[in-house]
From Swiss-Prot:
Residues 1-233 are annotated as: Alpha N-terminal domain (alpha-NTD). It catalyses: RNA(n) + a ribonucleoside 5'-triphosphate = RNA(n+1) + diphosphate. This is DNA-directed RNA polymerase subunit alpha. It is an enzyme of class 2 (transferase). It comes from Acinetobacter baylyi (strain ATCC 33305 / BD413 / ADP1). The gene is rpoA.
């Protein structure tokens, strides 16, 4: 195959292989060498950060004033109950927010199926466990669900200095409908050319959006963002940009850079958490199991991460990166 210097191959086919109802592999080929990583990284970042979704942002529980309370007859404490509510997969139709209610008498499990929903709200994981009641237990609560994008801390919803209402428990919201996404670039061949790329995107959603539709939305967002460059005037000087690394540099920094309290920092080091990339992969539940790390320290860690655009429970592909050698870890550990 012969080609001119200005000729670029464009993908001839896109293939979607459904793995389950919520996960799929998307295969795109052939691509010019290097375009697999270019497109794969851009789509992955958009999928994780920019697709709209819904999440529980506020909870009112009868008889409970704050998240550190307990409810008689409820097996879980309120913090664990709130964490379980974050696992609800909710779809809102033609609205930005909605209110759900729940009333239950024990004994038995409280699941998402027990929620009373408005006509324009759907919970796609009705079997999701929220809590467990004993024979003498009962619960009555109201949930506020909002639409959004990315990750939003509860503090960001209140202007500085504004007092939060007592009894209305605020939750950090992860709106993204994407649970997991990664990509690989394999070799592809067209006739005699073997220096081509094949892009394979592997993704899993929370069920509120079809994997194929998620890819379509991400590609549309990318197209809209770069369309302006097509009409770029010739007399406009191009702006040089430094290439971005696969791994965000902030993830390679030691946790000491977060300037946590001595107690929090020592608890993390005791769990072999030396780098910010190590920390963001831990969940709230995992950190609460750390000896001497209480809910106050957890709140401090979450707030510091949020100020840097990070959160707990992130999934990082290929961590630790090759640039973070084992001897670097040993050197840091010996400080």
């Amino acid at each position: 195959m012969t080609r001119t210097a200005n000729e670029f191959l464009t993908p001839q086919a896109i293939k979607v292989e459904a793995v389950s109802g919520t996960s799929a592999k998307v295969i795109l080929e052939p691509l010019e060498r290097g375009f697999g990583h270019t497109l794969g990284n851009a789509l992955r970042r958009i999928l994780l950060s920019s697709l709209p979704g819904a999440a529980v942002v506020e909870v009112e529980i009868e008889g409970v004033e704050h998240e550190y309370s307990t409810l008689e007859g409820l097996q879980q404490d309120i913090v664990e109950l709130l964490l379980n509510l974050k696992g609800l997969s909710i779809k809102l139709f033609d609205q930005n927010e909605a209110y759900l209610t729940l009333e239950k008498q024990g004994p038995g499990d409280i699941t998402a199926a027990d929620l009373r929903l408005p006509h324009n709200v759907e919970v796609v994981n009705p079997e999701h466990l929220i809590g467990t009641l004993s024979a003498s237990g009962s619960i009555k609560m109201r949930l506020k669900v909002s639409q959004g994008r990315g990750y939003e801390t509860s503090d960001s919803r209140f202007p500085e200095g504004e007092t939060r209402p007592v009894g209305r428990l605020q939750l950090d919201a992860s709106y993204s409908p994407i649970k997991r996404v990664s990509y690989t670039v394999e070799n592809a061949r067209v006739e005699q050319r073997t220096d081509l790329d094949k892009l394979v995107i592997d993704l899993e959603t929370n069920g509120t959006v079809d994997p194929e539709e998620a890819i379509r939305k991400a590609a549309t967002i990318l197209q809209q963002q770069i369309a302006i460059f097509v009409d770029l005037q010739k007399d406009q000087a191009p702006v040089a940009q430094e290439p971005r690394e696969e791994v965000d540099p902030i993830l390679l920094r030691p946790v000491d850079d977060l300037e946590l309290t001595v107690r929090s920092a020592n608890c993390l080091k005791a769990e072999n958490i030396y780098y910010i990339g190590d920390l963001v992969q831990r969940t709230e539940v995992e950190l609460l199991k750390t000896p001497n790390l209480g809910k106050k320290s957890l709140t401090e860690i979450k707030d510091v991460l949020a100020s840097k655009g990070l959160q707990l429970g992130m999934r990082l592909e290929n961590w630790p990166p090759a640039s973070l050698r084992m001897d670097d870890r040993f050197a840091y550990r010996s400080r």
